[in-house]
């Protein structure tokens, strides 16, 4: 109880001095002192076995637009769309064909 009181008093005294300038950053000594030690939870055996038992699914990266000065249709399924004042090439069969005009 006394430690909590000391922490709150130190925090209230030190805090105004740290906000005097925009570039002031709280020193790690004060922040670690004010936070104290946080209890660490250990995962139980059931959770550990579930996580280790099967591999996590991998996510496929989404493809972005290629930004070009001159855009071209690269296959018969590519089509042009004008959005936000720019021309875009979109393709349903091959997403690698997506292009954006500079």
From Swiss-Prot:
One of its GO terms (biological process) is mitochondrial translation. It comes from the Eukaryota. It holds the Pfam family Ribosomal_L36. One of its GO terms (cellular component) is mitochondrial inner membrane. Disulfide bonds: none annotated. The keyword Transit peptide applies. One of its GO terms (molecular function) is structural constituent of ribosome. The keyword Lipid metabolism does not apply. InterPro entries: Mitoribosomal_bL36m, Ribosomal_bL36, Ribosomal_bL36_sp. Keywords: Mitochondrion, Ribonucleoprotein, Ribosomal protein, Transit peptide. It is found in: Mitochondrion. Component of the mitochondrial ribosome large subunit (39S) which comprises a 16S rRNA and about 50 distinct proteins. PANTHER family: 39S RIBOSOMAL PROTEIN L36, MITOCHONDRIAL, LARGE RIBOSOMAL SUBUNIT PROTEIN BL36M. Belongs to the bacterial ribosomal protein bL36 family. This is Large ribosomal subunit protein bL36m. It comes from Mus musculus (Mouse).
């Amino acid at each position: 109880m006394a430690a909590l009181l000391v922490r709150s008093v130190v925090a209230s005294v030190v805090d105004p001095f740290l906000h005097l300038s925009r570039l002031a950053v709280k020193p790690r000594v004060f922040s670690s002192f004010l936070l104290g030690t946080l209890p660490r939870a250990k995962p139980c055996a059931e959770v550990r076995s579930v996580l280790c038992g099967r591999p996590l699914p991998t996510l496929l990266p989404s493809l972005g637009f290629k930004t070009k000065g001159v855009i071209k249709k690269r296959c018969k399924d590519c089509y042009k769309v004008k959005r936000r004042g720019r021309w875009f090439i979109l393709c349903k069969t091959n997403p690698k064909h997506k292009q954006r005009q500079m």
